[in-house]
């Protein structure tokens, strides 16, 4: 209920009064991960940074003071995080105690998360079957589907990062998200290459075709969270004047 009143007040202050405050915090709690994904550099880290409970508490309190009221806990793989007797659920409870209206986690779903106390859960899904496994590892897709089903969480959504190896799976992944009773929605983004991952870049012409496909699917009622205007802005910069 508090968020119902806070959102229009935040919008009024930002748009009318010109007071710029953050609304959401994305907090990376650890670089530790259990996969070696093609598009990610985290697994190459020999000494991953893992934030302490105290440090995370300070960062959450700081974000709250700035005006943020929604937090997304990410990694690495956040379900692996712990500090003594504190685990990921401890951070979710801490977020609520501080005053955040919602605490979300983003996971690769390789490990079970049926005991998660998060308000909502984002699962990284980079295509169906072999497409997902080609990027994240053999057998990972099967475990993802199993863990989503067994989680029994009412607010699970998936996010697909599109690249040159999985773009052919975009349409079937959108349809999978619609048909799966355990998934609420899907968000789609594109891989931004950095040194060592250039081969994953999807050329601008094909990217434009994929975006047009996503827009058609959205207009046909598929549960795609991206806005049409936002999708159009993902096209080649030269497409807009």
Language model segments and positions:
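Conserved alpha-helical substructure of the radical SAM core
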Residues: 1-115
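Radical SAM enzyme [4Fe-4S]-AdoMet core and its adjacent flexible, acidic
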Residues: 85-89, 98, 119-120, 124-241
